[in-house]
Amino acid sequence: MKQGRYPYQSWRQQWTEKDEEIVLSALKATGTEHLQDRPVDELSGGQRQRAWIAMTLAQDTDIILLDEPTTYLDLTHQIDVLDLLFELNQQQKRTIIMVLHDINLACRYADHIITVRDRGVYRQGKPEEIMTTDLVSHVFDLDCQMTADPIFGTPLCIPYGKGRKI
């Protein structure tokens, strides 16, 4: 996790007490204190994602960019990672920009969604304002029913699947 502080090191200034404090704070925020001495390749998928997020937090930036942070994770770990990112956004006021291909998780966790088609922005805005059956059909080439999530009230995509139209 200490590698997240690498951009702040130079030949004149090596590891400082401030670096140590920032790394410990990142470990605590991600619940990975007990993993700090283990090689990343020995961690489970969920632990590995948390370790990468801790490393990102250790960079101490206002904006965090993530590309598919839930890839290869089972549903429980996907929710754990997204809950963690949500908490970081709420508690530390960090801007988090991420790529997610799961429409339902994007709608549940995002304040703002940007949909992309043909290498350009197709539509953007609050999930409740832009996520429609027409958008999903055009952007993802998927027939679906959009409804409100019964628990969170966010848009929920129920795909029909190819050849299974109602």
Name these PLM-found stretches.
Residues 64-68:
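Catalytic Walker B motif of ABC-type/P-loop ATPase nucleotide-binding domains
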